[in-house]
Amino acid sequence: MIALIDPFKEEMLGRGFSAHHLGVHVNMLTGEMSLIKSDEARNHAKEVRDYIKEREIDDIATYDHESVMELASDFVGDHIVPEGVDEEYGNSDEYVDLLDWWCEIFSYNIAELAMCHYFETHKHLVDR
């Protein structure tokens, strides 16, 4: 499976993901680090996955980074920002920070889903 790391990274970087979003996952595969997710991180991952299911998105592992950002923005609008909040909030620093936070969470979690999908669909190349 280690042989698939570089092609995976290359594909994901080509889709606009940053090395930061991929680094943790790749380092876990190579044994260079282990990831112990906090309760908060697990809850965020569940929220992302639940939202993907709610939107009935089957091809999330093939999304480019721009599409992930749009999805994160929709999520913030649908689930985080209370209805009826005035338009001024949408341009505030607080809102931008909130949106950036959720974009990072979506990027990280979807990179993880993409890695699992990539390795599952390409494992035949190394299982010989």
Residues covered by each model-derived region:
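Short, extreme N-terminal segment that most often corresponds to the first beta-strand
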Residues: 1-37, 125-128
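Acidic, low-complexity, intrinsically disordered interaction modules
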Residues: 19-21, 25-121
